[in-house]
Amino acid sequence: MSKLLLILALAVLAQCALVAGDKPKDNFIRLG
C-alpha cells in the first residue's frame, strides 16, 4: 500500500522537476 503511494509521489515529483521550467500550473491542471 505504501509502495504504491511512494511510486505515485515519485512520479509526480519527477514530472514536476521536468516541467518546472515550462508551465507547472498547466501540468498540475492536467494531472488533476
Swiss-Prot record:
Record's subcellular location: Secreted
Keywords: Amidation, Secreted, Signal, Toxin
Post-translational modification Leucine amide, affected residues: L31
Residues making up the signal peptide according to the UniProt record: 1-21
Tissue: Expressed by the venom secretory cell of the spine. The spine is a cuticular structure containing a single large nucleated venom-secreting cell at its base. It is an independent unit capable of producing, storing and injecting venom. On the back of A.stimulea caterpillars, spines are grouped together by 50 to 100 to form scoli, of which there are eight.
GO molecular function term, any single one: toxin activity
Domain of life: Eukaryota
Coiled-coil region: none
GO cellular component terms given for this protein: extracellular region
Note: Negative results: has no effect on human neuropeptide FF receptor 1 (NPFFR1), NPFFR2 and kisspeptin receptor 1 (KISS1R). Has no effect on ASIC1a and ASIC1b channels.
Biological role stated in the UniProt entry: Is toxic when injected into Drosophila melanogaster. Also shows a low anthelmintic activity against the parasitic nematode H.contortus (drug susceptible Kirby isolate).
Family classification: Belongs to the FARP (FMRFamide related peptide) family.
Protein name: U-limacoditoxin(13)-As2
Source organism of this protein record: Acharia stimulea (Saddleback caterpillar moth)
